[in-house]
Amino acid sequence: GAQTIGISLALTIPETLEEKELQELMRGIDDTCRELSIQISGGHTEISSRVTVPVISVTAFGYLKQKRVYESPSKEYDIIMSKFAAVEGTAILLETESEKLQKTYTQSFLSGAAECAEHLSVRKEAAIAVESGVYAMHDLHQGGIFGALWELSRQIGVGLNVDLKKIPILQETVEICECLGVNPYQLISGGALLM
């Protein structure tokens, strides 16, 4: 629920990365930070033979408008999820498994699925949630919706009763995951938020 004001980056890049690719990567980071009004306060870059793709570590810092202290919940609460499960994972699969997917689906279908990756920030819904006084928030990243539900239940110290049919998931995600034999409920789900 904090307002991010700055980040520090640590990049580890492979020896084979071209300067043009590094410039493109940094331009993307800079554009995203400008769009979100976040300052890049510093960082570190190193070249390593131990990585094959760029590894980016981000440390964010910010502030809370007011201190909020909650005790463990004494009553039942509803869990609300923003956006859709597995959107980030779907975008990754579209990139890494493009040849296989192009043999099965039309370019129109794949382009439609790729458009969802443009909405991976949870900043707006997190700000609304804080203003609304939500009890807890958890982003759906590693481990997908299943991992996030487990972590949320541990965070607030209660068990959960979840109806899988009510978890929002795009049809494109379902079909792509089915084609590749991937469980969409365990797929990386950046861009969605549990509240």
Where do the language-model regions lie?
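Helix-biased detector of long, well-ordered alpha-helical tracts
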Residues: 2-194
